[in-house]
């Protein structure tokens, strides 16, 4: 059974999600204690936390906080997710990279096996296919472009503004590149690892600073965009209270981190603070066109889901067929060698006998293999289970 347990921006705001992470970790730990978890992949982004588990038995997970989907529904969700249909900004590309990273991490941690590998590889393939064959990701569709659009809605033109990017990771990079299209004055990048800040700043033709130099730089900054992976906040009312009152009232901060980087109390100083929740309401100028493209994407997902389901069903009998063929070939070869040893045959005749034994073996296995394939296609678990017992466990 494939199980997906998740919380995302569709059912919770950022604060609720932040508080729910530990609870989801606890549920996962309890499942590991009670059940034999065969495979696992974890996907964690700024606006979703998802766990995919492969379990060799039925399981009921009572929860009102999280979404729980199984088998076909879990597969369909992952394919939709990889395609950008489940994103806060429909069609954005960032989620596809995040799914690739989740798969790589699972490979590194040795928690992924053949089935989830097939599922995630298919999801990545579907995401790439949809972006290639539809226009769903065209027209400024990324969290980065959405963040910039939000700032423009709230602040007006970014022309001549000084921007501080805190965090040179994936999100910081996406937002920074969206800013390149605007006529900002200066983009300053701060990161705990200075080399990463310098690398991103070079791409932006901006300036890199060390993390502990931020206070000195804030006096020149109009817009702060923060997206670090820090477990605690890095900007608070106390930290920026030294700035002139007029400057604080003109300053806008956008917190794209989860858990949050910027404390809400900065608003008490007059700072305009926005977070990921506010991105939901960004005006989407291309929404109607992308909805049309989503219909095309849904058709691709439907076809690819059917192919994946059939492939997963056939995987159930792969070890049985492998064992059957290996054992049959082993016996055929043993008996052939005995016979050829007793008979004084020339090379041509030996080949004919070899061909004969192969033909007999293939014909004997033909109906068995076809029946197993039919059982897999019909999801006949009893037949497959019995075949495994007979051909695998008793050998």
Swiss-Prot record:
EC code(s) of this entry: 1.2.1.70
Keyword Transmembrane helix: no
Protein name in UniProt: Glutamyl-tRNA reductase
InterPro entries in the record: 4pyrrol_synth_GluRdtase, 4pyrrol_synth_GluRdtase_dimer, 4pyrrol_synth_GluRdtase_N, GluRdtase_CS, GluRdtase_dimer_dom_sf, GluRdtase_N_sf, NAD(P)-bd_dom_sf, Shikm_DH/Glu-tRNA_Rdtase
Catalytic residue list: 46 (nucleophile)
Positions of the record's site feature: Important for activity: 77
Comment on protein domains: Possesses an unusual extended V-shaped dimeric structure with each monomer consisting of three distinct domains arranged along a curved 'spinal' alpha-helix. The N-terminal catalytic domain specifically recognizes the glutamate moiety of the substrate. The second domain is the NADPH-binding domain, and the third C-terminal domain is responsible for dimerization.
Positions bound to substrate: 45-48, 87, 92-94, 98
GO BP term, pick one: protoporphyrinogen IX biosynthetic process from glutamate
Reaction it catalyzes: (S)-4-amino-5-oxopentanoate + tRNA(Glu) + NADP(+) = L-glutamyl-tRNA(Glu) + NADPH + H(+)
Positions annotated to bind NADP(+): 167-172
Assigned protein family: Belongs to the glutamyl-tRNA reductase family.
Entry-linked PANTHER family: GLUTAMYL-TRNA REDUCTASE
Keyword annotations of the record: NADP, Oxidoreductase, Porphyrin biosynthesis
Other facts: During catalysis, the active site Cys acts as a nucleophile attacking the alpha-carbonyl group of tRNA-bound glutamate with the formation of a thioester intermediate between enzyme and glutamate, and the concomitant release of tRNA(Glu). The thioester intermediate is finally reduced by direct hydride transfer from NADPH, to form the product GSA.
Subunit structure: Homodimer.
Known role: Catalyzes the NADPH-dependent reduction of glutamyl-tRNA(Glu) to glutamate 1-semialdehyde (GSA).
Molecular-function GO term, any one: glutamyl-tRNA reductase activity
Pathway(s) where this gene product acts: Porphyrin-containing compound metabolism; protoporphyrin-IX biosynthesis; 5-aminolevulinate from L-glutamyl-tRNA(Glu): step 1/2
């Amino acid at each position: 059974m494939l199980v997906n347990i998740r919380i995302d921006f569709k059912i919770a705001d950022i604060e609720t999600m932040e508080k729910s992470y530990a609870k989801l970790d606890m549920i996962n730990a309890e499942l590991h204690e009670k059940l034999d978890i065969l495979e696992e992949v974890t996907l964690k982004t700024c606006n979703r936390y998802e766990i995919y588990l492969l379990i060799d038995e039925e399981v009921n997970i009572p929860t009102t906080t999280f979404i729980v989907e199984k088998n076909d529904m879990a597969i369909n969700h992952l394919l939709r997710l990889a395609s950008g249909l489940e994103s806060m900004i429909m069609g954005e590309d960032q989620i596809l990279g995040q799914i690739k990273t989740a798969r790589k991490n699972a490979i590194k941690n040795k928690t992924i096996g053949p089935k989830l590998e097939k599922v995630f590889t298919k999801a990545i393939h579907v995401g790439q296919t949809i972006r290639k064959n539809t226009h769903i990701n065209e027209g400024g569709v990324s969290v980065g472009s959405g963040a910039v659009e939000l700032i423009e809605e709230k602040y007006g033109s970014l022309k001549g503004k000084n921007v501080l990017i805190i965090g040179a990771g994936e999100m910081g990079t996406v937002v920074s590149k969206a800013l390149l299209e605007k006529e900002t004055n200066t983009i300053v990048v701060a990161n705990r690892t200075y080399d990463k800040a310098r690398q991103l700043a070079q791409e932006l033709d901006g300036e890199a600073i060390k993390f502990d130099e931020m206070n000195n730089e804030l006096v020149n900054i109009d817009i702060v965009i923060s997206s670090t992976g820090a477990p605690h906040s890095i900007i608070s009312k106390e930290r920026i209270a030294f700035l002139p009152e007029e400057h604080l009232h003109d300053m806008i901060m956008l917190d794209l981190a989860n858990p949050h980087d910027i404390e809400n109390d900065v608003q008490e100083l007059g700072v305009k603070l926005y977070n990921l929740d506010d991105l939901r309401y960004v005006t989407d100028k291309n929404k109607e066109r992308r909805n049309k493209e989503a219909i095309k994407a849904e058709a691709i997902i439907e076809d690819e889901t059917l192919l994946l389901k059939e492939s997963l069903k056939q995987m159930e009998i792969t070890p049985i067929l492998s064992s059957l063929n290996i054992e049959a070939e082993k016996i055929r070869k043993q008996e052939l060698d005995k016979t050829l040893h007793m008979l004084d045959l020339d090379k041509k005749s030996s080949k004919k006998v070899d061909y004969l034994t192969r033909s007999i073996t293939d014909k004997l296995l033909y109906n068995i293999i076809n029946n197993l394939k039919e059982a897999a296609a019909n999801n006949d678990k009893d037949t497959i289970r019995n075949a495994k017992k007979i051909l695998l466990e008793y050998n």
